[in-house]
């Protein structure tokens, strides 16, 4: 049983009620009040057979765990995400060797070795995120890591390209698990005013692009954080101790497992269809995600062809993008939670968009600098400065966008919201880089990157729109999950 760190304030009644209001604004009353005959929910605090937390200071509640326990879980989940994305980006230099070994002459097939892995990021969350909200986060972490390790070994022993590509997409699906449910874990562990730094650490993995060692750490150190699953276990213990078989956890639905699974699987799709907030934020972050992958895959050819870099020194081209992201991450971590705490009155999820409003629009500026200075072969440091601006600006789109979804939909639906985000975002990462060659051949580096910059500019009003009208839209476009 967890112990409460005295340095951490337990959530009081006002925080819990604020969380309930936040849920009502986004997913209607489905998670708070009795519903129709399709799924009656048991949520009567006066019912002696309803098992709930033992007040706001219950040490079993993940919000009351010690700071060490919370941070350990955060680090493990972040390492999962980092390793999953590094497996995509680190393989790119080896694609040519794979093409030689399997006698692949089609460049598109070679590119698919990376793209199919990233496509798995979109497919996996459709099942994994809903399952985590029904059966808990921990079992998904265990299962995904096992499948990932097995099929990564399978990739190493593949005897033909078809086998390799199938194994790669399965690896991508397994790797997507921590990415889609990690936001839910963060929401389980940290109250809204502390999620900025936590989500920044978790989210940086996909921007930098499960392994066996991390899997061992998961088994040893990680515990379940899903509130519903924890209450189910608490009710199960109480039934065993008291002999009262009528005890049920709070917010239990009278549904069959098949009904629960079907409802959970359609959650991400319902969020995309019925919530303009989820759709537009996912499109915006998806374009930036795909843009990063496009730059990753084209840097070597651009700097070798234009500036005569050797294959060894071409790696320096990544410094601008990487340093921009790291600096942006540090600045965001320092400012995000501090700005939220300084707000007068109750903080809104939309307050996470302040930095996105002002700093996100510099991303197109970086693309213009990079494209036109590379086109005219201006000193190589100038286009790298442009990529620094791209990395810095994109950080203030992707991370605030995902934190906004987590804050807006709460722990109960955060995993589904992140799954919806991945469903839109990952295809951009998988396929946008395939357009780089025809784009640059047709338009050149200047206009080619300018087109990408103009597309980014089209989405710059999104955070302004949601900052002003987001709360009203969350109330108007309720999604019954």
Curated annotation (Swiss-Prot):
Low complexity: bias regions: 1-13
GO cellular component: plasma membrane
Glycosylation sites (chain numbering): 64, 106
Segments passing through the bilayer: 72-92, 111-131, 146-166, 169-189, 201-221, 276-296, 315-335, 353-373, 380-400, 403-423, 439-459
Function: Efflux pump that might be required for efficient secretion of equisetin or other secondary metabolies produced by the equisetin gene cluster.
GO molecular function ontology, one term from the record: transmembrane transporter activity
Region (Disordered): 1-58
Keyword Magnesium belongs to the record: no
InterPro entries to which the protein is assigned, alphabetical: MFS, MFS_dom, MFS_trans_sf
Recorded topology in the membrane: Multi-pass membrane protein
Entries under PANTHER family matching the protein: MAJOR FACILITATOR SUPERFAMILY, MULTIDRUG TRANSPORTER, PUTATIVE (AFU_ORTHOLOGUE AFUA_3G01120)-RELATED
Species in which this protein is naturally found: Fusarium heterosporum
Family the entry assigns: Belongs to the major facilitator superfamily.
Main location: membrane
Assigned keywords, A-Z: Cell membrane, Glycoprotein, Membrane, Transmembrane, Transmembrane helix
Signal peptide (from-to): none
Protein name: MFS transporter eqxG
